[in-house]
Amino acid sequence: VSGRPLPGFFLSAVLPRRFRSRVCRLCRRPVNGFRYCYRCNAAPDVARPDAAGFVSYAIKNSQAGQDMYRYKGMQPSVQAVNNVQLLLEHGLRHLRCVNQIVGTNVQAVTVMPSRSHYQSGAPSQLQKLCALRLPAGLPTVGIEPVAGATSDRKVDPASFVVPQPVGWSHVLLIDDTWVSGGTRMSAVGALRAAGAAKVSSLVLARWLDPGYGATPELVREVTEAGGWSSPQGVCPFTRDGVCPRVR
């Protein structure tokens, strides 16, 4: 692990206390007066992760948002790759936190494949970073999009296949960006159908579109209140950012 600090433009997905009731309790999307956003509320139980961690918020057109695209482009930006690697490293430092929340240790990791640019046998940029940074000895579980499946944002576990049966008690699903969440929850459901008893997720960036729904008002208010903070030192798996093992 490099130990380098995250660039200052990355924003923690943990908000000050007075704003926390205004984001979905599962995916942290801004909502108006509801515990869950529409998509998370409508998702079947089998598709909801047992714990969901978010390292940062990435606001559309911001430097952080651009990095989440540039790190996996046709000609990846070295700077963006390094920054996304730092997000991954930070999230992986909190494996003990998700272990405690779920009640059993992570026994294997699944890295989310691209549905729009999937090539069998060709690792994605995120899979390459995970191969470098995952703890030694932690097995990986393969998952593949079904032929013809598209990024339609629907929650459909049948849109993924897990080639080998999964007998682990706890599988961690890692992805770079959560937009609608449909793809992530579909993968969670597929892992459960393959035999995983518990499935948690770690997302490096929760995407925010300041032109959508309740997002612009919340982004403006948090900005005016000086409420954004760095992901550094914040637990991605808890709503208050406090590691459960030290409560």
Protein language model regions, located:
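A broadly conserved sequence feature marking short terminus-proximal activation segments
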Residues: 1-17, 207
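Active-site-facing substrate-recognition patch
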Residues: 8-14, 22-108, 135-168
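Conserved acetyl-CoA-binding loop-helix of GNAT-fold acetyltransferases
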Residues: 84, 182-186
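Residue-level signal for inorganic ion chemistry
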Residues: 107-110, 199
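Glycine-rich phosphate-binding loops at beta-strand->alpha-helix junctions
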Residues: 113-122
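Residues at alpha-helix caps and immediate loop-helix transition turns in enzyme cores, especially N-
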Residues: 121-126, 183, 214
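Mobile, glycine- and charge-enriched loop segments
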Residues: 159-180, 199
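PRPP-dependent phosphoribosyltransferase catalytic core
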Residues: 185-247
